[in-house]
């Protein structure tokens, strides 16, 4: 999923089983977080009634990955799936890209619902910055235009965002 996202610029997706399947994704999720790679990771989970009861292969993947994801969801109602999936992909690719975990209990996966995506994503408090601060850009320009031997060290985000030529 990480390689796909890096190669295409699109959101990478993976689906893993509960327990060890979920925990084996942690290094990849952390790498994607540090490198700003957009991922949506779907993890299996024990049925909702067994969460918190130390069930076989129950893992708190939300808690484990909290420090290295943009957001995590534990879907407890199948009716929430369209909204959660739409939000997960939106969050993974907007602002600074990064991984989002969607934890899916077995009973939720087995349930059925009418699947209609919401037309738009409405997340309270989430306002990704999409434009540079004009004052900072002007200051950088002034410093670079006066420099005798300027050096710019730019991260991979320049390539990912397609701004190489502009830089």
Protein language model features and the residues they cover:
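N-terminal alpha/beta PP-like core and its mobile active-site loop of ThDP/TPP-dependent enzymes
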Residues: 1-167
């Amino acid at each position: 999923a990480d390689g796909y996202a890096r190669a295409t610029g699109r959101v990478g997706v993976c689906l893993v089983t509960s327990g060890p399947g979920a925990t084996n994704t942690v290094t990849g999720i952390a790498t994607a977080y540090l490198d700003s790679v957009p991922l949506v990771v779907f993890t299996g989970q024990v049925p909702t009634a067994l969460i918190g009861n130390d069930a076989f292969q129950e893992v708190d993947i939300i808690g484990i990955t909290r420090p290295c994801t943009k957001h995590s969801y534990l879907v407890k109602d199948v009716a929430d799936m369209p909204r959660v999936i739409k939000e997960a992909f939106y969050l993974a690719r907007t602002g600074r890209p990064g991984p989002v975990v969607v934890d899916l209990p077995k009973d939720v996966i087995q349930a059925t619902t009418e699947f209609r995506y919401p037309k738009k994503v409405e997340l309270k408090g989430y306002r990704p910055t999409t434009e540079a601060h004009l004052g900072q850009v002007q200051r950088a320009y002034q410093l670079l235009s006066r420099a005798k031997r300027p050096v710019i060290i730019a991260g991979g985000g320049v390539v990912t965002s397609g701004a190489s030529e502009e830089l």
